[in-house]
Each structure stands twice: as C-alpha cells, then as structure tokens.
From Swiss-Prot:
Family: Belongs to the peptidase M50A family.
A single MF term (Gene Ontology): metalloendopeptidase activity
GO biological process, one term: protein maturation
Swiss-Prot/TrEMBL catalytic activity: Cleaves several transcription factors that are type-2 transmembrane proteins within membrane-spanning domains. Known substrates include sterol regulatory element-binding protein (SREBP) -1, SREBP-2 and forms of the transcriptional activator ATF6. SREBP-2 is cleaved at the site 477-DRSRILL-|-CVLTFLCLSFNPLTSLLQWGGA-505. The residues Asn-Pro, 11 residues distal to the site of cleavage in the membrane-spanning domain, are important for cleavage by S2P endopeptidase. Replacement of either of these residues does not prevent cleavage, but there is no cleavage if both of these residues are replaced
Compartments in which it is found: Membrane; Cytoplasm; Golgi apparatus membrane
Classification via Pfam families: Peptidase_M50
Name listed for the protein in its UniProt record: Membrane-bound transcription factor site-2 protease
Binding site for Zn(2+): 167, 171
Enzyme class: hydrolase
Ranges in the topological domain labelled Lumenal: 25-74, 108-140, 248-442, 473-488
Membrane topology category: Multi-pass membrane protein
The keyword ATP-binding appears for this protein: no
Species of provenance: Mus musculus (Mouse)
Length: 515
C-alpha cells in the first residue's frame, strides 16, 4: 500500500503551490509583476503540473546538431531503422506481456475444486508460484510504495529525469540536423513524475520529407536505447572501474541487516561481515549468494555427518510427533538452541533425536545419506534437520566470526540482509558507495530501456504515433493513392496499439495494487 505520509506530502505540496499561484494571480498588487516573472523565467503552473522552458541551451543544441554532419546523418539513420523495428516489435512485446499477466491472474485465482486441497498440493502450488518468479515480465507497472521501495525513489526519479533529458536531446539534435527550427528546451514535473521536452517549429516539421521526420521522431527512443546499452557496459565494467578502491571475488560484504531480520543477534550477521559460504555453497559475489539461496530453498534440506559416539553423547530420550504440515518435531522444550534431527540407523530405520544444533553441525561435513559419511573405521550417520516444509537450517560462514546458524525461510534471509560484492581496500572508503552506483545504473538501464520500448508503441500521444504516420507516408504514399485509406490504416494500427498499451497498464496496476 502507498504510504499515507507520501500521499500527504504530495497532495499537500501541490495544494500549497496551486493556492499560492492562484492568490498571486488574483492579487491586485502582485498580479502583473508575478505574471511577468513567470513569463520571463519560462514558468507555467497548473494543477499538479509545473513546466519550465528556456532558450539558454539553444546555442549548445545548434552546435551539436551542426557538428560532424555526415556522422550524425549515419547516426540518425541507424536510429530510424531501430525506431521502425522497435515500433513493430512493441506489438509482440506488449502482447506477450499481456498474456503473461492474464496467465498470472488465472494462476492466482482460486479454483472452485481446490478448496479442500491437501497440504502436499498447497506445497506444490507454492513451489510453482515461487519458480514463476524466475520468469519475470520484461515490462512491469511501477507504483511507489508498493513494488518500488520508498527509500529508492531518489534513484527512480533521477533515472527518469536523465532518461527523459537524453530522449529529448536526441529529438533536438536530429531536428536541427534536418533544418527544423529549435525554439527551446524544458523540464516539467507532473505530480511526482519529472520529464523533459523540446519545442520545435511545427511548420518546418511538416514541410520536410517523411524520411526526415522519421529520423527526428525515432531519435528519442534511439538515444534511450543507446543510454541503456552504455549503462549495461558500465555495470559490467564496474569492478574494473572501482578496482583501485574496491576488490571483488572473495565473498559478499554485509551492508545492512534489517531490524526484523532473523539474522540479527549476538551470533548473527553484522554490517561489515564478509560471507564466504552458505552451507557448502561457495559465495564469491552477489550472484553466488542469490543462486546459493535459491538452491537451498528448492532442494531438500542438507544433512551433517556425525559420529555414532558423538550422537550418543549429545542425544537424549525424546518423544516425536507430527506437525500440521507432516514434518516431525522431537524437541519439546521450545529451546532456541536445540533442533530435531532425523537419521537412519544401521538397520535403515528412520529415527529422530533432539540435539544442540551448534554442537551437532559445527566442524562437520555435509551429506545426503549415510554413505557420504563413510570415513575411517568409526561409524557415522547423516543427520538431517527435521523442520517445517519451507524452513531450512543454513550454516553461514563469515570468518573470522563463528558460523551463524540460521533457521528459517531462505527468502527471509534474502530480503532482510543487504549485501555487496565490493570490498573496500581502505578503511576510510564507504561500503555503500558501490551499492549506490550499482543501484542507480540498474535503474537507469531499466527506465531508459522502458522509455524506448513504451515510446515506440504506435499509440496516441506517444512518439510511436508520429513514427507510424511518417512511416506510412514514406512507404504507402506511392502504393495507395487515396490518403483517406492510408489514414484509416494508420488509425486502426494506432487504436490497436493504444488498446494494447492501456490493457497492459490497467491489468498491471490491478495486479500490483489489488494483491
């Protein structure tokens, strides 16, 4: 749910701005001077919308647009080809996204025949829904406070603004390259959404050829696509860029542990700890951490080898009983240090025993069965923690501290512990800086790429509308002599694109906010 405080700040702030604007424009004393000030500074204010336009960047735009004319010609030709391909590809992408959303809605809807499903079927559906997370959609609706953390709004809006500015710079340079008069550049704020725009002389735009128009209209999404590619390159090269100050490949560094995290405590994880293993799974970077947790979550609980003499020494008589999910519990004292283990004796009979977890699993090798523990003459058993269905016992190695024994769902560890692959070489360096840079670049890649895809959709009021019109003018004018037929074809394509985009946005919003 969207935080109430965020809504109050947004609505209250806009109300104050609009009322101040209304009062000043209604004032006998300040009306003319205030309106002159707005006009001189290129400002305009309306409900939930502030717009600023200036001509101070015109010289820079004209300089960019007239420099290396031949190279720019080839550059925007590439952009034109990309824009046309992106326009038609957007239909396929939106159609696929819509089908994925509908399939997800059907999967989330309770079946009338499943009201009395067993615990095993419940476990199966939970597992399948979790695995579907790996098949994420390319396009997703983002709502601040719901699927966009409030503490990452700065990254989001900064990336949106930069993507918008780069988009409009593309339009502006292409327009000047095609001899269209450039009036100015501006920035706007709509509710909480920042953006940019360029003001072009419409008459000049209508007089140039359809191919020239295509170069201008495709330039924005082309620049967004290139920006996303540069972001990917920067992300890949980030370890090299930060190499003089940070090193990687030896583990993951803990940057934050949430207050409600199960990993918090005297023998838990602390900021600055270096994690090298999860169970027997080596961790050298963030990707390893995520893959290890996935493996632990979706595979059966791993066991630990223990000698028969140690098992006899640590265990004590217990009475085992079944939990509601079918698993077995045998520790009746509600101890935070004891865990119920199961194992098979020499006669292959399954037994249960309650053991102090740390003494049982410390300095032992992992196993799947008794065969994995056959070493030397002493008899050993593979003891497996008997836990609830989705709960795991995870041994987290973070030397030089003693291993942390985590009992809980692996996803809780994933969501409540923040990590980074970058370890500072010097104590004065911040452990958060690489995370900040990495997070911002990821937002820039996602949002610039999304802006390129969405703007390419042949939809009313988007770049795709003008790309489509210019494309039809360039290709169908000589084939279809009747302009009305050509306009009708364009209208139905635009209508289809608009409906497809609206359906994706509507269902996407419903999926995000209703669940």
């Amino acid at each position: 749910m969207i935080p109430v405080s965020l809504l109050v700040v947004v609505v209250g702030g806009w109300t104050a701005v609009y009322l101040a604007d209304l009062v000043l424009k209604s004032s006998v004393y300040f009306k003319h001077s205030y309106e002159d000030w707005l006009e001189n500074n290129g400002l305009s204010i309306s409900p939930f919308h502030i717009r600023w336009q200036t001509s101070i960047f015109n010289r820079a735009f004209y300089s960019w647009g007239r420099r290396k004319a031949r190279m720019l010609y080839q550059w925007f030709n590439f952009g034109m080809v990309f824009g046309v391909i992106a326009m038609f590809s957007s239909f396929f992408l939106l159609g696929k996204t819509l089908m994925q959303t509908l399939a997800q809605m059907m999967a989330d809807s309770p079946s009338p025949y499943s009201s009395s499903s067993s615990s095993s079927s419940s476990s199966s559906s939970s597992s399948s829904s979790s695995s579907s997370l790996h098949n994420e959609q390319v396009l997703q609706v983002v709502v601040p406070g719901i699927n966009l953390p409030v503490n990452q709004l700065t990254y989001f809006f900064a990336a949106v603004l930069i993507s918008g500015v780069v988009h409009e710079i593309g339009h502006g340079i292409a327009a000047i390259r095609e001899q269209v008069r450039f009036n100015g550049f501006g920035i706007f704020l709509f509710i909480i959404y920042p953006g940019a725009f360029v003001d072009l002389f419409t008459t000049h735009l209508q007089l140039i050829s359809p191919v020239q128009q295509l170069r201008i209209f495709c330039a924005g999404i082309w620049h967004n696509f290139v920006l996303a590619l540069l972001g990917i390159l920067a992300l890949v090269l980030l370890p090299v860029i930060l190499l003089p100050f940070y090193y990687t490949g030896v583990g993951v560094l803990i940057t934050e542990v949430a207050e409600d995290s199960p990993a918090i405590g005297p023998r838990g994880l602390f900021v600055g700890d270096l994690v090298t293993h999860l169970q027997d799974c080596p961790v050298t970077n963030v990707q390893d951490w995520n893959e290890c947790l996935d493996t632990i979550a979706y595979e059966p609980q791993i066991g630990y080898c223990i000698s028969a003499s140690t098992l006899q020494q640590l265990s004590f008589p217990v009475r085992a009983y079944k939990r509601l999910d079918g698993s077995t519990e045998c520790c009746n004292n509600h101890s935070l240090t004891d865990v119920c283990f199961s194992y098979r004796n020499n006669f292959n009979k399954r037994l249960h025993t309650c053991l102090p977890a740390r003494k049982a699993v410390e300095a032992t090798q992992v196993c799947r069965s008794n065969k994995d523990c056959k070493s030397g003459a002493s008899s050993s058993f593979c003891i497996v923690p008997s836990l609830e269905t989705h709960t795991r016992l995870i041994k987290v190695k973070h030397p030089p501290q003693i291993d942390m024994l985590y009992v809980g769902h692996p996803l809780h560890l994933h969501y409540t512990v923040s990590i980074t692959s970058f370890i500072p070489r010097f104590n004065f360096l911040s452990i958060d800086l690489p995370v900040i840079v990495e997070t911002f670049v990821k937002y820039l890649i996602s949002l610039s790429g999304a802006l390129a895809i969405v703007n390419a959709v042949p939809c009313f009021a988007l770049d795709g509308q003008w790309i489509l019109n210019s494309f039809l003018d360039a290709t169908l004018t000589s084939v279809i002599g009747d302009n009305d037929v050509k306009d009708l074809i364009g209208f139905f394509i635009l209508l289809g694109g608009s409906v497809l985009l609206a359906a994706n946005v509507t269902l996407g919003l419903w999926m995000v906010t209703a669940r």
